[in-house]
Amino acid sequence: MEPGQCEIARLPEEILSAALSRTSPRDACRAAAVSPAFRAAADSDAVWACFLPPPADLPPLADGELLLPPRGKKGLFLRLSGSPALLPGGLSMWLDRESGAKCYMVPARDLSIAWRDTPRYWTSWIHLADSRFPESAQLRLDRRSSRRPTAGAISGAVLLAYANYMVYKLDDESYGLDWPADASVSIGGTDLARKVCLQPNPQRSHAEDVVLPRERGDGWMELELGEFVCEGDEDGDVSFGLAETKRLNGKGGLIMQGIEIRHKN
């Protein structure tokens, strides 16, 4: 060993693996650059199996999502955290890169949307090249806007915080969406509500408690509708709602891809 070389690198690989498995995916990747001994431990299945959900908690993926099986547990983690994978039921799923928590996106087609099949209010379902799903919902004319999406069973580790986000776009002729709407989240008999705004008007000031959208890196916008906490390992039902029924003005130009349910760091 050369002078100044890290003594910890002389530890057996199984001890290094046990220590790294108690850190985070980011820390394990950083440790791999320390030395060959660290790299062997940091890239091992023993470490990355601890960052992945248990096999029984990983839902089956849709056909064709893993054409080339990943190399080892680290490869599987990087695949599932690098981009969403479609599930057989139409949802998409990915892993949070920091915590390994499962995240989901529910497509607009699976949401309960008022008058969704009435052409007067909603155009036919449209396809956008930058959407994860074959169809997105486009609002044409709505005198009363109401959406109540429901994501079925959500399971997580003790005290895992999640938030749900509406992912959408506004076309060049959007209108009537600059007034605060009522968003809600319900889980385990607890209902939480907040005010949100889909299209802030720069000429109008909003109350401090009104949640505003932000632009995403993929060209869409997202609006946080609420958050909740998973306690324990039992599954539970969580539902989300968005409604604006006080101002009966027309609304249009909203294109909705779906609802994301993400771990909140």
What are these regions (language model features)?
Residues 3, 10, 14, 18, ...:
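Plant-skewed but cross-kingdom recognition/interaction modules and surfaces
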Residues 29:
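Short, basic-rich loop-to-helix N-cap that marks the start of a DNA-contacting helix
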